[in-house]
Structure formats: C-alpha cells, structure tokens
Amino acid sequence: MPAFITFIGNKLSNSATAFYQKNFGVNVTEWRIISQLAIEPGIPASRICQVIGFDKGPVSRNLAALQKRGLLTIRTAPDDGRTHSITLTARGRAIHDKVIVAALERERRLLSCLRKDEREVLIDLLRRLHENLGAVTGQSTS
C-alpha cells in the first residue's frame, strides 16, 4: 500500500508542477509554501518544513526564489539572524488566490469518481494514516 500511495502522490505532484508552472509560474513546492503561508502567515521556515514534510534545503531554496520574485517577505531576528517570520506579499497573495481556484478544481476532478460519503471516508482514512506516520518515521506529524 505505501508504494501505491507513493505512485499516486508522484503522479499528482508531477502533473501539478507542470500545470502550475505553465499557468501560474510556480512549481508545486512553491505552491505548497505559498498555500501554507496563506493558512499560517508569519510562520518560520521550520514550520513550513514540518507541515509539508520537506527538508530545510529545498524549502530554503524555494523561499529564496519566491522572495526574489517578490511573492513573500522574510524577516530575520536581529540578534541571531535566524528567520522568524515569513509572510506573503500582496503579489504572493494574488498568486495564491488564483492558484487555489485551479487547485480546488483539480481536486474536484480527481475525486469525481467517488460519492460524497466515499470522499469523507477517504479523508478520514488519510488523516488517520497521517497521524500514525510516526509509527514508521519516528517523527511527530503535528
């Protein structure tokens, strides 16, 4: 089953990258970061890594690229230089507001083969699996 979930995830991620890049100029990792910042404005990079499940290196590179394009601002603590607050700019929020419409439509099309009750069961099962990831990763998922 983990392989099957991975296959589905890879295909979704690859097609999302191509779609988001072509239509909005962002890759799927950038979209995940933008999306998380829309949900939790002002969070540090460590929180982004924790939520999207990526290592610090790829997240840092994507944050730098998004900052360079004017989609977010990164504030650092004056005493130690570490990042403590990342927020979307107005331009970043505008990209988010466009991409979220397309992302929700992609989700709707993907799940269209399931009845409403099946979608609810699927979401419940995926949440439970996510909460239990620590059983195989040794890490917290919160």
Question: What role is predicted for each listed range?
Answer:
Residues 1-24:
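N-terminal leader segment of winged-helix/HTH proteins
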Residues 9, 35-39, 100, 127:
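Short, locally clustered residues in the helix-turn-helix/winged-helix DNA-binding domain
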Residues 15, 32-38, 94, 121:
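Pre-recognition alpha-helix immediately N-terminal to the DNA-recognition helix
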